[in-house]
């Protein structure tokens, strides 16, 4: 990617080059233009894939109401610090309401969401969400579109804003601050973001999610 650093006169070309660079370094799947609902379903699918034991989910995927139990727990978290503890807590508890799962129906089940010991191994999944769609807290503002998110096991933990060559990196920082001000990262799956990255072909800044 560095060889082409002077050639990124268009932001999209920079985004594509960064995507290929990530794919060459362990990230293994690209999701294009996902909505929040699609990312929640993607997370649900990964949780199911990582919890197929008979005493967990077996052969029965999470129902919409079971995934809502997970999201309700996410939405109860009020700070990035607490969210980090949630993610690194390795598992989440739900009460099975899928009647087809006669083994676990009506029981509390603990589901693995992330294991720090499985970084780059085990059941870890590394995905790139390109140009995710955001809903603002105020419907009058309309929807927004980010540049890139990095997902670990379906959880969007890194948000990246890009600017082309000869645009100051502060403009990407401003874009992130604007999204924060508009409440995009306040609730739902996007509230799981831990790190913001502002990036041009010439410069990169990153900082922890400071919360509201």
Describe the function of each predicted region.
Residues 1-212:
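An alpha-helical interface "stripe"
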